[in-house]
């Protein structure tokens, strides 16, 4: 397994093995290879959580930039990841589905991000749905773990609670719902179906190509933990 030197999963807890839940190149924005907890908190079972943003063939997250990029919000559908298919990272059973949260305008400007941060407390008080947005929780078949995939597009979830899914089966599409400043996928593994009561579990991804954010030839990774800003692409199983 390849991981950054400061990644310290519990040695008594074997990592949850997953495949990347998307196709094409995505940049790793937050990762436990950089720090644990990766999002600055152990709350909601996200100690070992990942955030990924989709890229185009020029490694851009959005198709354009203009005056709105500098001073205000932007349409979510301007971003490459918006409405990209999100796939099951392993075989399992859908134990929870939440849909109905709107997709927000996206934010890249410092001013719009500051305004958003000032409303963070309000979202937390509104409950889990306001944080995760539209999401799917899977109970994995091959190990005692649950995986949450969050910030999906409003109305995009294609699987009902109770459904059994295979690895690679579409669950929904990437959106900008919940606590999200631009379309991205949040994923983490946990030891309970409800993130409120769960503890986070470490993850390794199997079968992908990785390359530095600044460019360079991709290299194959059999089992690994993507580094921060690393660009990853799933390889066929």
Feature locations, PLM:
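Short, small/polar residue-rich loop motifs at catalytic or cofactor-binding pockets
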Residues: 80-82, 131-132, 157-158
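Terminal presequence/propeptide segments associated with secretion/organelle targeting
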Residues: 1-37, 43-45, 231-237
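Acidic, glycine-rich catalytic/binding loops that coordinate metals and/or anionic ligands
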Residues: 37-39, 128, 163-166, 188-237
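Short, charged beta-turn/beta-strand-edge "cap" motif at the junction between a beta-strand
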Residues: 58, 100-102, 171-181
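A residue-level detector for short acidic-glycine micro-motifs
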Residues: 30, 54, 96, 151-154, ...
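Short, well-structured beta-strand-loop connectors
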Residues: 86-96, 159-173
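Short glycine-rich loop/turn motifs
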Residues: 47-49, 83, 132-136
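Zn2+-dependent peptidoglycan hydrolase active-site motif and core
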Residues: 93-153
């Amino acid at each position: 397994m390849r991981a950054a030197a400061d990644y310290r999963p519990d040695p008594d807890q074997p990592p949850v093995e997953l495949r990347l839940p998307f196709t094409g190149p995505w940049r790793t924005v937050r990762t436990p290879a950089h720090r644990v907890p990766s999002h600055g908190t152990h709350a909601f079972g996200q100690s070992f959580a990942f955030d990924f943003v989709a890229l185009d063939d020029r490694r851009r997250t959005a198709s354009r930039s203009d005056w709105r990029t500098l001073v205000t919000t932007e349409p979510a559908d301007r971003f490459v990841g918006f409405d990209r298919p999100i796939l099951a990272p392993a075989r399992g059973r859908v134990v929870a589905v939440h849909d109905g949260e709107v997709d927000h305008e996206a934010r890249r400007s410092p001013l719009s991000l500051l305004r958003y941060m000032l409303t963070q407390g309000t979202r937390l008080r509104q409950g889990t749905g306001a944080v995760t947005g539209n999401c799917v929780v899977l109970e994995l078949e091959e190990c005692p773990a649950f995986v949450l995939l969050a910030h999906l597009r409003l109305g995009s979830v294609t699987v009902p609670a109770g459904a059994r899914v295979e690895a690679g089966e579409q669950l929904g599409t990437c959106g900008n719902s919940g606590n999200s400043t631009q379309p991205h996928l949040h994923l983490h593994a946990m030891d309970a179906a409800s993130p409120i009561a769960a503890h986070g579990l470490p993850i390794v991804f199997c079968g992908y190509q990785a390359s530095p954010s600044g460019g360079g030839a991709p290299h194959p990774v059999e089992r690994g933990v993507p580094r921060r800003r690393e660009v990853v692409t799933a390889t066929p199983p």
